Amino acid sequence: MISKYCRLSSPRSDLIIKTHPHAEIIWWGSALKHFSPDDCASLERPVANGRLDIDTPLTLIAENALGLFSSPGLEGHRNGLDASPVFYTVDVEHTENTLRLTSEDSVAGLRLVSELVMTPSGILKVRHALTNLREGDWQINRFAITLPVAERAEEVMAFHGRWTREFQPHRVRLTHDAFVLENRRGRTSHEHFPALIVGTPGFSEQQGEVWAVHLGWSGNHRMRCEAKTDGRRYVQAEALWMPGEKALRKNETLYTPWLYACHSADGLNGMSQQYHRFLRDEIIRFPEQKLRPVHLNTWEGIYFNHNPDYIMQMAERAAALGVERFIIDDGWFKGRNDDRAALGDWYTDEQKYPNGLMPVINHVKSLGMEFGIWVEPEMINPDSDLFRLHPDWILSMPGYSQPTGRYQYVLNLNIPEAFDYIYKRFLWLLGEHPVDYVKWDMNRELVQAGHEGRAAADAQTRQFYRLLDLLRERFPHVEFESCASGGGRIDFEVLKRTHRFWASDNNDALERCTIQRGMSYFFPPEVMGAHIGHRRCHATFRQHSIAFRGLTALFGHMGLELDPVAADAKESDGYRRYALLYKEWRQLIHTGVLWRVDMPDSSIQVQGVVSPDQSQALFMISQLAMPDYTLPGILRFPGLAAEVRYRLRVIDHPEIQLVGEGGHTMRRLPAWMNQPLEASGEWLAKGGIQLPVLDPESAILIALERAV
């Protein structure tokens, strides 16, 4: 007999599912200590007058044929027929942390399998699979995962952005109707990171109850949350398909991307900590699990101006600054003198590198550094030998003129010959050169993405996965970075195949404070590429001190992006200092528990990391703009052990001069900045410390260590 109720549990949350006649989540929230299936009777709904005379369940597939009248989880037809499916549960497989529900519609000839996995970290993984059981193609228009949230979830947090300004949070109230994000750009996108957070009104970093979902998919997507007229609320996530893009022949099966969901009763910090633990436990895999090395990327240092002798000088200076991985960016391959030509011609430029890449690689490695290189396999320039040979290899619709983007087209990886060509060129690059690291870029969105006359954006994304999977299998020691004009392809599915994200093409430290904070809601610091750029940022033309740039890059995977040969002595000393500081603290930053701290003054941003055993912590206070108040207020440290006494010390701070010494912000420093301070974790969490008055666009770094 099929069990009517099933439970999936983690230490922090519980999920209760009614399995039949239809699969429906009836509880998703904080862990239940005294649950009995008999308790579920209390949640049986009344049937309101003036509507249908039956109860309408909000199922995992959200079926309008049951009278839901909401955004359906499945839309499709068989030549106009079988367009209103209703699924009845026929089998349930339940283990401690996994539930597999099989449902069928015998009239429409469809089978739905829903997989739910509750991970130890508290992340709920959900995926659907649809199989066509009958003759005749079943055309799929939409296929979404639907999860209910509590009626008290009245506020939505989502992320918007653009090139050089990713992960910008915004909020809306969810009282009636729906909030929808759609991405049709063919990659995860800068504009709409595929995630939604809904919660109790005013939820914050440290307060409130939230439910979050992230769709692990690197292509087009739709995210939706809705407040129904009956008061129920739900979130929905799906890959978004163009007309005619998906159809199932008899016995064919289509899977949705995995949805990663989370409940937190401890605000946004509790949510992030569960996502971070999940990624560290189940997805992030570094070769040999080594510490994240300090990078130097040549892009903003020399752009396309490649000279092997000069690059070797850059490598020497980089090594002297403490760099551990040296990456040659765009400009190394045949004819690549600017961004208008040569994509697709993946051969060493013999004019720039008459002796090939090996002299540079050998020199880099002789200096004790790893070697990395930039590629953009999915793109092709019209001005390239490859395009002149195969103009039909671009991703496009027949009969239409395809616009260029950044002077390039998208290479159609659905063409076997095009796929094989790219794969073989990278077998050459990685097989004949001791490359340790690949920065994989993708600098153009997809327009009229077609193959053989049919929409093919989804297929292109899957071919990208396939290509990367093959290269990872062939070269397991090579690490890959996901870059798409900065942060245009950041999601859990691509992270399964990569080791680092380039968070943004914007190295401005002030902008990075917001970008990196936004990214930290779902991703831990060790996969967040964060570089110290030039004193004058190439993206914004703002100028920042080396201290502000260095500390901002500290809470990620640190690197430099500049020309170390051209740097003056003061800048070089700063690069060396912050590379050394990063090495000292990276073990903590990349394994500890991340905390973002609520501050009453929005011009002050605070984040920190506490070690798993709570013996040490590192907190950064960034003054983003002029403070709202004369005094910046009190910082109360979360995450510490109440009974432990901690010694507080300042690790780094801007040059502070008091009034009378040439300064202008303070006549007297807080006492703890002049004399050693020891206090209990309880006092530091409840009493806290009075912050100093800082100039805009500066930061201070504080360490807390268990007192002996």
Curated annotation (Swiss-Prot):
Entry-linked PROSITE patterns: ALPHA_GALACTOSIDASE
Record-level Gene Ontology MF annotations: alpha-galactosidase activity
One GO biological process term: carbohydrate catabolic process
Record EC number: 3.2.1.22
Catalytic activity: Hydrolysis of terminal, non-reducing alpha-D-galactose residues in alpha-D-galactosides, including galactose oligosaccharides, galactomannans and galactolipids
Entry-linked InterPro entries: Aldolase_TIM, Alpga-gal_N_sf, Alpha-glycosidase_related, Glyco_hydro_27/36_CS, Glyco_hydro_36, Glyco_hydro_36_N, Glycoside_hydrolase_SF
Top EC class, one word: hydrolase
Highest taxon of source: Bacteria
Pfam family, one: Glyco_hydro_36N
Gene3D superfamilies: Aldolase class I, alpha-galactosidase from lactobacil brevis
Active site residues per record: D441 (nucleophile), D505 (proton donor)
Keywords, comma-separated and alphabetical: Glycosidase, Hydrolase, Plasmid
Family listed: Belongs to the glycosyl hydrolase 36 family.
Subunit structure and binding partners: Homotetramer.
Record protein name field: Alpha-galactosidase
Lineage of origin: Bacteria, Pseudomonadati, Pseudomonadota, Gammaproteobacteria, Enterobacterales
